[in-house]
């Protein structure tokens, strides 16, 4: 998968503006990952419930005040909804509803969100 990401970046002439990187959730962010990147693309990351807190921590470490994470999420199990509840407490989240293709992928229980660092510094309850 990593080599495919690198190939897509090259094919779309995005070097040096975009980079692919492997992240192990909950670990120190590797030096090759830009500090507080402008855009993070995340897809199909919600699949192993014990790792949910590690994913939240990693996103908190990555997101700066001007960062946005485009987070694609497929709802499969109740546990997946628990992740979304955790994320909504930790971040400012908004479902993207103005995508012309949303109807087709929503039918497959796939949803797209923006995730941003919480501006107020307070968690929603």
Language-model features, listed with the residues they occupy:
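S-adenosylmethionine-dependent methyltransferases
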Residues: 1-125
